[in-house]
Amino acid sequence: MKYACLILLWSLFATMALPADNLIQSISIVPCPESITPGTGYFTFSGKTDFTVENEEQAEVARCFSALFTQAAGFTPCVKVGEKKGKISFLTDDALKSEAYHLEITPRQIIVKASDTKGFFYALQTIRQLLPASIEGTAVAETADWSVPAMTIKDEPRFGYRGLMVDVARFFIPKENLLRIIDCMGMLKINTLHLHLVDDNGWRIEIKRYPLLTEIGSRRVDRPGKSFPVVIPGRVNRL
């Protein structure tokens, strides 16, 4: 019994000595924020949740986020412009860099601070990642728990250019898929889409002033010996 008590006490002290990174190892945010300070309890989204924002630009960011709950949860948090009290409050902090944000989540409210709409948008994408995966669904998830853990997050981009290239010149994809890719880019805080529209395989963009670009250039015809040397056993025919 004595040894069991000692082991229990040692375990408790070891847990207290763990750094915050280990205490929040179950929290997955991509990319990893600059700092995360865990809190106590959870904030729960419901039909009574409301946003208070300072202007219409912030309101548009909040409405796009609220729309996720419309399909997945069956309720839509309302957005109020100019109000001072709300469950989720947007506050402009000019001391923060562009795209940076501070996020304070408590069981009673969420305070979002940023210097521009990009920062407010990325803060909500962090909350989006903290919510259950059901938030990405198109049908109401009856049993989902729309809670996020209490914490304080400070984040700013390490790189100004964070890009993804999509090669639509050689690999065709439906428009709906491309729009979904753009949505996922925003969630992962990737800020630049590089559309690879034209390649040697073919010209894909219709320009009415230059119809031959698509009539001829849209297809590539192999012409042996015209672009590369033709290797024949015993000798090499050069261009």
Name the predicted role of every residue range:
Residues 5-15:
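Bacterial N-terminal signal peptides
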